[in-house]
């Protein structure tokens, strides 16, 4: 049973006094920054391009205030996350969020004003004022957007329409999470319980086929019933993306979304090409699953059934020890930072009443790279620990080696650092496995992760691309059209006929990622790149490990593909994907051999 916050040993809580010693200090900073923003509002708009010195001064002031706002926000947010019932910290978070909004409003002038400068004048100023070169890559990114920025009047109109453009995704979220009441179903104890989005996953992992089937059919009966409403929200959302792309002179919504993060479209195309080429591997995995479960007719509700009963148990101390041992492979510098994170209270470990669920790595440029966990002593908790430590090490290395302006990194790169660690942990545990049953469990765990991240997220990415293209070509995205398209893609991926799995055609209706605007493909590219890099780190040279650290240290000082190239990955080539699929095939072959030996019985 979860404890109250004050019952958790101090050593298992994060130390937020390293950010602000007291709440009063936070409150004083909030007041001071509000005043500073009011002053900026009166003095800076309209003067950015008065001179090279003015551009430098206003830019540095903006970045400095941004740095302070982030620090304030992080403290309030983490204080709230550790016990969401505390009204004081709910209020702190609201105030910090309002400050973020105010900062955005005050500096709304910056980008449109900067884009009035010609490249000739900018280059002249760059030659005259050496310090401007510290921000050259930031300015270069702004220039890259210039062709897609509208007049000040048009930008103002678009900004005013922002709330309207957000309404399809907000309507979906409210309808799906608040308005819809899912049916009652039986759990493994034969008790009637309320089906929720939260408990659906655990019910789908039940060893009782009847429990899985009932939960699956109950969930999708909801999406079948309301399919026309879900189709309308998704269709409108796609229209918003396509309209924005058209207004800003992009060729497509996909081009607009990827250009925003400076990721070439070729990365997406290369992923799709490699996925389609390697779908027979997923079909092989599905066939093996049938064999292990002893059935010839696998249903979609059998995809998540656990294939192993082996239960790993790790208390937190053992988990930390194992994580330190596994991550030592990166060398002295990385090892030292991991030690600091584990010993200097960067981590909030245990579950307590009111604490935010799940796990994350957080912090700001001026703080430790904190981690929130909810440790339950499972193998998944150990994987979560090395995953979040990967994010935190990425943050720590970036902040130590880059100025604030480049002291962050995009999601496109973020998931690589975390899942590389997960892959190295898998490699280590496989090496240490004592018998075939352990190997079976570990191989199954990794293959399921690969399937769920690389294959499944690519399936979503393919559907997302096709519905945007269809709308742009004048197709009406009715529920019938969406059902048919999704069912066809699902059948192609899993080799399981829609006829025998009619409910799966409605799955598109429950995926929130389809409202995120070409976001989901990054999970697949990230996991594949991490698989490729983990092999280089484990089996490669000291130079390979050093190159990996260079990627962690680069932050956003270069474009994403240039940064990951430092580690040795070319995201516009299929090489990294082919290497990842080769490992998937090798591990699948090993699992097949273990099944032949009867290890699963």
UniProtKB/Swiss-Prot annotation:
One of its GO terms (molecular function) is metal ion binding. Belongs to the peptidase M3B family. Keywords: Hydrolase, Metal-binding, Metalloprotease, Plasmid, Protease, Zinc. It comes from Lactococcus lactis subsp. cremoris (Streptococcus cremoris). The keyword Plastid does not apply. This is Oligoendopeptidase F, plasmid. GO terms for biological process: peptide metabolic process; proteolysis. Binds 1 zinc ion. Hydrolyzes peptides containing between 7 and 17 amino acids with a rather wide specificity. Its EC number is 3.4.24.-. Its cofactor is Zn(2+). Zn(2+) binds at residues 387, 391, 394. The gene is pepF1. The active site is at residue 388. The lineage of its organism: Bacteria, Bacillati, Bacillota, Bacilli, Lactobacillales. Pfam families: Peptidase_M3, Peptidase_M3_N. It is an enzyme of class 3 (hydrolase). InterPro entries: OligopepF_N_dom, OligoPept_F_C, Pept_M3A_M3B, Pept_M3A_M3B_dom, Peptidase_M3B.
């Amino acid at each position: 049973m979860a404890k109250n916050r004050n019952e958790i040993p101090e050593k298992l809580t994060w130390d937020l006094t390293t950010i602000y010693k007291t709440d009063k200090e936070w409150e004083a900073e909030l007041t001071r920054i509000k005043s500073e923003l009011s002053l900026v509002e009166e003095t800076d708009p309209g003067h950015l391009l008065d001179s090279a010195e003015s551009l430098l001064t206003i830019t540095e002031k903006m970045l400095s205030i941004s740095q302070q706002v982030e620090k304030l926000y992080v403290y309030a947010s983490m204080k709230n996350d550790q016990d969401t019932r505390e009204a004081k910290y709910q209020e702190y978070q609201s105030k910090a969020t309002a400050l973020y909004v105010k900062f955005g409003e005050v500096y709304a002038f910056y980008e449109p004003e900067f884009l009035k400068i010609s490249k000739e004048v900018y280059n002249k100023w760059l030659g005259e004022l050496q310090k401007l070169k510290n921000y050259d890559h930031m300015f270069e990114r702004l220039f890259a957007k210039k062709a897609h920025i509208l007049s000040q009047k048009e930008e103002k109109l678009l900004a005013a329409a922002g709330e309207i453009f957000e309404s399809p995704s907000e309507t979906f979220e409210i309808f799906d999470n608040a308005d819809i009441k899912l049916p009652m179903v039986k759990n493994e104890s034969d008790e009637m319980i309320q089906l929720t989005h939260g408990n659906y996953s655990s019910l789908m992992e039940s060893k009782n086929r009847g429990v899985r089937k009932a939960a699956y059919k109950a969930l999708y009966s909801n999406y079948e019933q309301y399919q026309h409403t879900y189709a309308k929200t998704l269709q409108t959302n796609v229209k918003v993306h396509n309209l924005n792309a058209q207004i800003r002179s992009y060729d497509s919504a996909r081009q607009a979304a990827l250009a925003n993060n400076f990721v070439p479209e070729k990365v997406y195309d290369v992923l799709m090409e490699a996925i389609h080429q390697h779908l027979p591997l997923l079909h092989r995995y599905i066939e093996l699953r049938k064999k292990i479960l002893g059935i010839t007719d696998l249903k979609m509700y059998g995809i998540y059934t656990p294939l192993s009963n082996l239960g790993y148990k790790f208390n937190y101390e053992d988990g930390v020890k194992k994580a330190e041992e596994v991550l030592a492979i990166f060398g002295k510098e990385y090892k030292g930072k991991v030690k600091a994170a584990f010993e200097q209270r960067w981590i909030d470990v245990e579950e307590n009443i009111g604490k935010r669920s799940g796990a994350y790595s957080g912090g700001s440029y001026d703080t430790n790279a904190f981690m929130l966990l909810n440790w339950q002593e499972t193998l998944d908790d150990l994987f979560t620990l090395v995953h979040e430590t990967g994010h935190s090490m990425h943050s720590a290395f970036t902040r130590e080696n880059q100025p604030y302006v480049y002291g962050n990194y995009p999601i496109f790169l973020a998931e690589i650092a975390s899942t590389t660690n997960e892959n190295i942990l898998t490699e280590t545990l496989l090496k240490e496995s004592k018998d075939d049953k352990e190997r079976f469990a570990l191989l199954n765990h990794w293959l399921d992760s690969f399937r769920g991240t690389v294959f499944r997220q690519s399936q979503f990415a393919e559907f997302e691309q096709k519905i945007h293209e269809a709308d742009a070509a004048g197709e009406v995205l009715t529920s019938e059209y969406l059902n048919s398209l999704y069912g066809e893609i699902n059948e192609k991926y899993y080799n399981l006929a829609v006829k025998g799995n009619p409910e799966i055609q409605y799955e598109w209706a429950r995926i929130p990622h389809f409202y995120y605007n070409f976001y989901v493909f990054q999970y697949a590219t990230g996991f594949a790149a991490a698989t490729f890099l983990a092999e280089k780190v484990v089996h490669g040279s000291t130079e390979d490990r050093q190159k990996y650290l260079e990627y962690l240290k680069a932050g956003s000082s270069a474009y994403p593909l240039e940064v990951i190239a430092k580690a040795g990955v070319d995201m516009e080539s299929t090489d990294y994907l082919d290497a990842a699929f080769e490992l998937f095939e090798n591990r699948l072959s090993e699992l097949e051999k273990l099944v032949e030996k009867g290890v699963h019985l």
